[in-house]
Regions:
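N-terminal hydrophobic targeting/anchoring segments and the immediately downstream early-domain regions
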Residues: 1-185
Length: 185
């Protein structure tokens, strides 16, 4: 019958490892000033992803995206941590240019780099606090090991290259602290 076939399909799906192609967890934690990632670790009411739901849903890993938003939506605590960057902050009600596809202002490289480092540090804090549950993966061996040991594999990805200067120094630094993917989204 159709119902028995459905049960077989669901049974196979439950056993199939899930790998998330893109999530915005790090941005959400950064914007809520949760630099330790506690909302992810212990579960959170808002959002789509946290450690308890990852385990329950069979998530084996994913691309944890780092997106640097317009300065007018950066958390106020960010500016308190980086008073030297306040000159880059724009007013929240500023009219954005109509030709800007994402409806955000062009952001400075120094702001983007500082925000990117903070989001990577959130991922590192989460991994450091839970070495038995998840790990930042920088190569295939680590990824395979995570899957084999039932640990969640975090692959760090940046959306856009605003954080990288023209001499590519920041790219090398970001690579050395775990970044492995760059894309437009």
């Amino acid at each position: 019958s159709k119902f028995s076939n459905f049960r077989e399909i669901v049974s196979k799906m439950i056993k199939t490892p899930v790998f998330d192609g893109h999530n915005d967890l790090l941005l959400a934690l950064w914007r809520s000033n949760d630099l330790d990632g506690n909302d992810f670790i212990f579960g959170r009411e808002k959002g789509h992803i946290d450690l308890p739901r990852c385990k329950k849903g069979g998530l084996k890993g994913g691309f944890f995206a780092i997106f640097v938003p317009a300065t007018n939506v950066a958390p106020e605590a960010f500016w308190e941590r980086h008073p030297d960057l306040v000159k880059n902050k724009k007013g929240a009600k500023e009219k954005m240019p109509s030709n800007n596809l994402l409806n955000t202002e062009q952001i400075s490289q120094t702001y983007a780099y500082a925000a990117t480092i903070e989001m990577i540090n959130i991922a590192r804090n989460i991994a450091d606090q839970n070495p038995d549950k998840l790990e930042i993966c920088t190569d295939y061996g680590t990824l395979r090991n995570c899957i084999d040991k039932e640990k969640i594999a975090l692959l760090l990805h940046i959306e856009g290259a605003e954080a990288i200067g023209s001499d590519l120094t920041q790219l090398e630094i970001l690579y050395n602290i775990g970044l492995r993917s760059i894309g437009p989204v």
